[in-house]
Amino acid sequence: GLRSKGIYVLLIRQTQVSDFQRIFDINATEEEKTSRIDLARITQLDSWSDYHKVVVVEDEIIGFLLVMSEASHYDGDNFRWFVERYSRFLYVDRIVIDRTFARRGVGSALYSDLIKFAATQSWSTLCCEINVSPPNPVSHGFHARFGFKEVGRSSKAGAPKVVSYQVAEI
């Protein structure tokens, strides 16, 4: 097919329950950069999300983007950090792309779709956190291209991770 020639059509669509196993599989390859989630947690996160879409190429899910608004019941500590400081925002819980398609514009296509969605709902602030330790330079570069800037840092006592809190005004 076209995919073998490096030519493919990206379809971005709303996530369905039948996608959760593939989301689990893709996330499992990047747990050190995101965090571990099981199927029950994916179901819960999906129920709290305001935007949860997958990218499909030739009927195969190759990535996903999971986002909550400030009004979400999401229980994450990093999300709460933003709730305490910003009144209206969209929080990127995770964006994960299959390694086969890394650095080919798939993440950018998802973020462009998210920004369009945000505009329809009058959201102008995107928030996320990026690992500083262990470092995630690919994510830092990707988010910088979308205008994300550091607004704080967090490290939990005894925890191996240090994160950079990032905000982009869109």
Predicted regions span which residues?
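Conserved active-site alpha-helix within GNAT-family acetyltransferase domains
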Residues: 132-152
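Conserved acetyl-CoA-binding loop-helix of GNAT-fold acetyltransferases
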Residues: 97, 103-116, 145
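Conserved acyl-donor/pantetheine-binding loop and adjacent beta-alpha core of acyl/acetyltransferases
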Residues: 66-94, 158
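Conserved GNAT acetyl-CoA-binding A-motif
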Residues: 118-132
